[in-house]
Amino acid sequence: MKIAIGCDHIVTNEKMAVSDFLKSKGYEVIDCGTYDHTRTHYPIFGKRVGEAVANGRADLGVCICGTGVGINNAVNKVSGIRSALVRDMTTALYAKEELNANVIGFGGKITGELLMCDIIDAFIKADYRETDDNKKLLAKIAHLETQHVNQEDPDFFNEFLDKWDRGDYQD
């Protein structure tokens, strides 16, 4: 099984710990970045994880940022992605078994590495339990998806990154 994983600069260490854990379990890890602690933007890496899952390069995805909120919102904008921001086992299993979540998101500064690893392991092993009700709910969610014209362009964020480099945006 292939697992795509991505993060922002705030939780690179946590992502690497999770990546090492997944590899130790025999999973192939597709590291979508970021790879260091240089200030960056979580939407880039959420998009990369989402695209890896949506296009079939990865079976499932893991997204991590400081609180998990930003990167989880970003990954959910990719068509075909159903990501759940979780902090506990019950929510993660519900997301997979009832809503067929294909990405799981975490706040790396909220949830500890060991708990993240336990939750991810259970999430991967859980199976979607298809029912008529679940199918109807997923169809309604899929109906909400919209595709932006240039969204699949790998340079989609360049305009915003150029503005950042010029100092147009501030933290």
UniProtKB/Swiss-Prot annotation:
Catalytic reaction annotation: aldehydo-D-galactose 6-phosphate = keto-D-tagatose 6-phosphate
Protein EC: 5.3.1.26
Pathway named in the protein's UniProt entry: Carbohydrate metabolism; D-galactose 6-phosphate degradation; D-tagatose 6-phosphate from D-galactose 6-phosphate: step 1/1
Top-level taxon: Bacteria
Transmembrane domains' residue ranges: none
GO biological process: D-allose catabolic process; galactose catabolic process; lactose catabolic process via tagatose-6-phosphate; pentose-phosphate shunt, non-oxidative branch
One example GO MF annotation: galactose-6-phosphate isomerase activity
Pfam hit, one: LacAB_rpiB
InterPro entries given in the database record: LacB, RpiB_LacA_LacB, RpiB_LacA_LacB_sf
UniProt keyword annotations, A-Z: Isomerase, Lactose metabolism
Enzyme kind, highest EC tier: isomerase
Signal peptide bounds: none
Coiled coil: none
Family that this chain belongs to: Belongs to the LacAB/RpiB family.
Subunit structure: Heteromultimeric protein consisting of LacA and LacB.
Name this polypeptide is given: Galactose-6-phosphate isomerase subunit LacB
Organism name: Streptococcus equi subsp. zooepidemicus (strain MGCS10565)
Record gene name: lacB
